[in-house]
Amino acid sequence: MATEEIDMSYWDVSWGEFNEDKNSSIFCESHPHIVNSHGIWEVMTFKRGMNFWEYPLPNLEILIFSTFFIWRLLDISFNKIGLRVPRFTYMMIAGIILGQTCHFSNKSWIHDIFFPDDNRPKVAETLGAFGFVLYWFLKGVTMDAELPFRTEKRSSVIGFITVIIPLICGSLTFRYRERRGDSSILRMEYRLIIFLQSISAFTSIDTLLKDLQIKHSEFGRIALSGAMVTDMLAFGVTFFNAIYYEKLYGFMQTVGFCLFVVVMICVVRPAMYWVIKQTPEGRPVKDFYLYSIFGIAFACFTFFNKVIHLFGPAGSFVFGLTVPNGYPLGTTLIQKFESFNLGSILPLFGSLTMMQVDLLRLFKESGDLIRMEGQIYEVISFILLVNTTKFVVTTITAYAFKMPLRDSFALALVLSNKGIFELAYYTYAVELKLIRPEVFTILAAYTLLNSIFIPMLLELVHDPTKRFRCYRKRNLGILKDGAALQCLMCVYRPDHITSMTDLLETFSPSQDSPMACNILHLVELVGQANPMFISHQLQKPEPGSTSLSDNVIISFRGFQRQFFEYTSLDIFTSVSVSQHMHEDICWLALSRSLSLIVLPFHRTWSVDRSTVISNDDNLRMLNVNVLRRAPCSVGIFVYRKPIVESHMAKSHSKICLIFNGGKDDREALAITNRMRLTEKRTRLTIIRFIPKSSEMDNDEWEQQQSINLKESVTSIVGSNIKENDAKVTYIDKAVSDGSETSRILRAMANDYDLFIVGSGSGIGTEATSGISEWTEFNELGPIGDLLASHEYPSSASVLVVQKQVYIHHTKSQRRKSF
């Protein structure tokens, strides 16, 4: 095979410990060789040698600094004007800028730095490829490996259709063009375009959602679940094609991959959990384990690349899936490697890849797009056809599953996004000579434009402030009889432990009313420590030490022992700054599909209510943030003790429900009814405040309206509250303004152990007229604020309930439903 001769006259290679043969076709290194120069004046001092940028280390440093400076400058500038684009897009743009700068100064030293005309090893390209493999591994670590098995029907169908329909459409179009016989694109190039434009790569979607800060949302979960389904289909299509086209060799590839997955599941995954159990609670994972995992990740890359001849980074990604995400192992790996990789190494991959794009050629051929001819028109038109099909079918499918039209558009945009995976695979295909450089230029340019404009369009159609809102109902009102109550109890201070356990006891779990309790201990982050999210089911304290959540664990385990047959209990600790605690609460509720979050009230008083013991503004802000963003119903619990009397064998628990018929009151009724499903003797009083009529006296009016109250309550909760139940009392009170409401509530202050009320109860009616303006704590609503106030003469506890706000679609496309 003939060897191409390369002009080496520019380089004084012998000075840098390099050698070349007589015709300059073979380039060798002498080891150990010099990696850096003798100084910037080397040529002037020694009258020979190389410029300092010609040595490997300075050249690498210049490339790293150049790419970092440009992409960070773009990132800061775009953020200043309010345009949020994935960071990898800026890295690609940096490559375009550097590449075109070098092309315009073809004979200058700038061109020699970025495009050295020699056969020396490309250190920067190798390091960039290393960064890409590390990036794929870390993406696997951040992903929940069990997500595909928990994917709901909606995400599975969306993921399936968004791949299959574009694949079919693209294949039919390709066959039509092939029959015409005038195609300038090779068969393999067509197959590659169809495949990569039809799938939605998880890594690209995850990067987009993370950089736009909508990953931890119901919308983000659907998008990631759909992307994961497309990835699984992509693996299936890959191996089907391998077996179909390459017969035995393809079959051996498939077998090798299956064996690899079996080893990951049966050997590596249990080993990861063993590492977690060896790590004491609150302590970092040993460096030995971290670097061993790091080494195995690149061994998996080698196995895929050299043994079964598949896309190498996919091996590191699959291995990353075996690492349990979250604290301590997954979080530690991310904290240790991600920032360095994204800041220094990965930009080399994005920039150096895009530097190979021949932008001048694209501009010269752009006229062919208008004339609808030529190679560029054929590629772009085919890409647009496949992507338009993908966008339309995704939108229709999402809308058919009751997603709002705007969110259906947004989901279609997300699943149509192209980014780091597609660019890497195009580069891989060029190396394997599956596609030609001129086609690569078109595909890379399209990928760049796609990654710029889709995030901008997404900003227009998607509202990120509602990222924790759900598309499905998650509240107590929809729970069927016998269904477990999925709840989250939050503990901020030690005195909240007793209040939350007492409230749980009022539910008294039974066979007809089981509970799945999740306890979250909130610890404020101080100093320079890293945030942590600890699952006490997986991690145990170091022998001889205690956990910072010991009191929480012991107390709630005691509650579980009381009702062990009908209660499951999971305890977590979140250590974070107070400004972000609400995100941990909402994300835990979202990820575990909970129906109720219970938060402690931020103010507590002495037993005689004469002084305020604590008034924590941080806790109040936490409660407000959760109420605004919660994916399910929320209760704020004001603890004032008498609720504990309900556990006494001979006593009745006296509960008062204030029911004015609003959405929050209906949820409060559902919670109250849940408490009545227990075996305990509970006396319930349901009070409703109605407008006073001038045509009849109060007693006659209230007696007539109490019948309607019974019918309303029975219609909401069904047969659980019987019409003639002696333990349920219905009271209608006619009022003309809020002062009468206050007087009535004060008169019954000492008659009950627990008051339950909706946060929106009575708003806009005579019941709250005149007192709404004096509300101190708006999150409780006017009646809840009255019951929780310092002046209210009662020692009864108060539970204020807000029903879930969920996103749905109707014919009028309203964004919220109650």
UniProtKB/Swiss-Prot annotation:
Family note: Belongs to the monovalent cation:proton antiporter 2 (CPA2) transporter (TC 2.A.37) family. CHX (TC 2.A.37.4) subfamily.
Gene Ontology MF terms in the entry: antiporter activity
Tissues and organs where the protein is expressed, per its UniProt entry: Preferentially expressed in pollen.
Gene Ontology biological process: monoatomic cation transport; potassium ion transport; proton transmembrane transport
Protein's name in the database: Cation/H(+) antiporter 6A
Cell compartment(s), UniProt: Membrane
The entry's keywords: Antiport, Ion transport, Membrane, Potassium, Potassium transport, Transmembrane, Transmembrane helix, Transport
